[in-house]
Every structure is written in structure tokens, then in C-alpha cells.
Amino acid sequence: TVKTEPTRFDDGETRVAVILPFLLDRFAPEEQGRMVEFYQGFLMAAERLKNEKHSFEINTFDSGFKEKSLDSLINSGALDNMDIIIGAYYPNHNKQLGRFALEKRIPLVIPFSNRKDELYNNPMVFFVNTLQSSIMNDVTGNFVKRFPDANVIFVEDTIKSNKESFIKSM
């Protein structure tokens, strides 16, 4: 038999930190609604796992708006004993949490971002959304295979568009 080291999940209860911008200090219904909807889905998933005999301690934190730093939360020690951290939303918050997760060896799940940045090489960071750059070749290859003789016209909104590399690859 192979002797294994105990993992952070061996004590029977998983300590989860959820860090999202609920924006409790301002009125932003669209952004707040998106976070509340995600959180409700998270709680439904946790409830289902509880029904399968998994035990959770869920700690929820409001990260605030993007200009707010997470230093006070990180320095408070509230995250030190978490088994997993879910969040945040804004890139600057993700960077702060990524450094913390690496230092403390706590897995960080980023549910919203799909941007390739310095967190991409952090072994403690897990992205839920697939990076667009990692699927671009498959999408364009399949399109060209399926529609080899198609005359395609792309209409691009040059103000909001970030699809230039996709369009050029087609």
C-alpha cells in the first residue's frame, strides 16, 4: 500500500469561502442581481452535495466594487483555514486572491473570468470558463471544414468588439 499525506479535505467538513461583489454599499441592481443569481446556484449545488452526505461550512464575503482592495479580508485571517476559495469577479481581486492562494496552498476557483493573465500559470488557480484563445483554433478549423466554400461576411461593432483575432483567423 502507498501511504498518502492527509489532504485539506480529510476532516469531513469542507470550509468554503465565497468572495463576490454583492456591492452592499451601493445601488447596482444589474451587477448585484448577477452575483445573487450565481450565489443562489452555488447554494443549490451545495445543498445537493449535502444530500449526498458532504458537509460544508460556507463563509460568504462581499468583495465590494473593483476599486476596493481585499487586503483587509486577507490580513484578517478569515481565509487562512479555508479548504477552497470561490471568487472573485474583478481582475484586481483575482490577482490578490491568486497570490494569497499560492502562498497558503488553497485552491482558488475563478468562476467568471476567462482572461489569460499571470494567474494562468498559478497551480492553485482553477478557471471555470475556458480561455477563448484555447478554443479558437478548434472553432475556426471546424467552421472551415463544415463550410469550405462559404462566402462569410462579418459585421463587427468596432466600439465594443474584442473579436478581431477570431475574425482574422476565419
How would you label these PLM feature ranges?
Residues 27-40, 161-165:
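Glycine- and acidic-residue-enriched helix-capping/strand-helix junction motifs
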Residues 67-83:
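Short, well-structured alpha-helical segments in soluble
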Residues 1-20, 27:
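Pro/Ala/Gly-rich low-complexity, hydrophilic intrinsically disordered segments
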Residues 19-21, 61, 153-156:
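Short hydrophobic segments within beta-strands
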Residues 35-62:
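Signal peptide-proximal N-terminal region
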Residues 86-87, 93-155, 160-166:
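Extracytoplasmic ligand/sensor domains, especially the bilobed periplasmic-binding protein
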Residues 15, 83-84:
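Structural motif
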Residues 21, 43, 47-51, 75-79, ...:
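Sec-exported extracytoplasmic/periplasmic mature domains
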